[in-house]
Design a protein with these regions (language model features):
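SAM-dependent methyltransferase catalytic region
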Residues: 118, 122-204
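Conserved beta-strand scaffold positions in the cores of enzyme catalytic domains, especially
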Residues: 26, 105-107, 160
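Short acidic (Asp/Glu) and glycine-rich catalytic loops that position anionic groups and cofactors
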Residues: 39-44, 106-117, 176-183, 203
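Conserved S-adenosyl-L-methionine
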Residues: 62-142
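Intrinsically disordered, low-complexity boundary segments flanking structured domains
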Residues: 8-17, 93-96, 140-150, 199
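Class I S-adenosyl-L-methionine
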Residues: 1-77, 99, 110-115, 151
Length: 204
């Protein structure tokens, strides 16, 4: 029998009401309200952070992409594996404010160390994520200041996790001493670990 090869292309498009919306292949301000990197720089400028990034993404880009896949759902998690300046966080908070949604974000960024001669280093920052944290803080405060009626309804808080050594002790599998095995079973967490550290490590 001859093998049969199927070349399947699956497209997933969002529904708006009872109709399918096919996103445009071209992202532009006139087509779908998406700005350029120049606008991204101006957004950082209002926080005094524009000199640290050459080509920051505008929040309108992330907002458009997020809305494209979360149109009728208000409790999603948006994951950004190359978070850079933290645009995704600000865009999701803006969307939550505009559409009364409760979307959350997870930003992942390597702790890229700043050059000692860079503006960011001279201003006290040591890594890219440190600048992004500042931006997210300021962006959340700005949204609340511009929308005082929201009060505590809009969640602008976030947690920061850094890659670190495990809280679980390394077990010596070659140990012959029964006492060592019993001690490990009794307390297999590092001495300086807190209950919260352990819970988060197990969760993540």
């Amino acid at each position: 029998a001859l093998p049969i090869f199927l070349d399947l292309l699956v497209n997933i498009f969002p529904l708006q009401g009872d109709r399918v919306v096919i996103p445009s292949d071209i992202l532009s301000n006139s087509e779908n309200g998406v700005d350029t990197n120049e606008r991204g720089r101006k957004e950082l400028e209002q926080y005094g952070l524009d000199k640290y990034f050459d080509f920051p993404k505008p929040t309108s880009l992330i907002s458009y992409l997020a809305n494209m896949v979360t149109y009728d759902s208000k409790d999603n998690i948006i994951l950004d594996f190359f978070s850079g300046s933290g645009t995704t966080a600000e865009a999701i908070m803006i969307n939550n404010q505009e559409y009364s949604s409760n979307n959350k974000f997870i930003l992942v960024q390597l702790p890229e160390v700043l050059d000692v001669n860079s503006d960011g280093y001279k201003d006290g920052y040591r890594t890219i994520p440190e600048i992004a944290e500042k931006r997210i803080d300021l962006a959340g405060d700005k949204i609340i200041a511009e929308n005082p009626l929201l009060g505590g309804q809009l969640d602008i808080g976030f947690k920061v996790f850094e890659l670190d050594k495990s809280n679980v002790k390394k077990r010596n599998t070659e140990a012959q001493d029964i006492v060592q095995h019993l001690e490990f079973i009794e307390d297999n967490f590092e001495q300086n670990s807190t209950p919260l550290d352990v819970v988060y490590e197990i969760m993540l």
